[in-house]
Amino acid sequence: MTYDFRAEIVKAKNTGSAKSGSHHWLLQRITAIILVLCSLWLLYFTLANKNSDVNIIIWELKRPINLIPLLIAVITSLYHAMLGMQVVIEDYISCNKLRNTLIIAVKLFSILTIVAFIVAVFYRG
């Protein structure tokens, strides 16, 4: 049986640090606060229009006062989810190729979904 008598710091050296952990943590908290505010707006909007016709709701959502919070909510929620999935993938997937592929896939999915949502909102067909 072999023993490794090196100090723990030596074992941990050069194993790779994200170097952006605090920035990532801060972004998650900021997006969470924005999502709480957008959820309050969504709750108000839903209660204010609970007996409205679908056409009235669509007309209301096209107004800038309602469209801007909706855009912020969707974009922020997708970005928040992307950050969270990235952390989970980095923490639990040990194979570098698979980890990098999954992170790229999550980012690509988020970006494509955000672009599709923006196009759908502003498309006047």
From Swiss-Prot:
Heme binds at residue 80. The heme is bound between the two transmembrane subunits. GO terms for cellular component: plasma membrane. The keyword tRNA-binding does not apply. SUPFAM superfamilies: Fumarate reductase respiratory complex transmembrane subunits (SSF81343). NCBIfam families: succ_dehyd_anc. A ubiquinone binds at residue 92. This is Succinate dehydrogenase hydrophobic membrane anchor subunit. It is found in: Cell inner membrane. It comes from Rickettsia bellii (strain RML369-C). Its cofactor is heme. Pathway: Carbohydrate metabolism; tricarboxylic acid cycle. The gene is sdhD. GO terms for biological process: cytochrome complex assembly; tricarboxylic acid cycle.
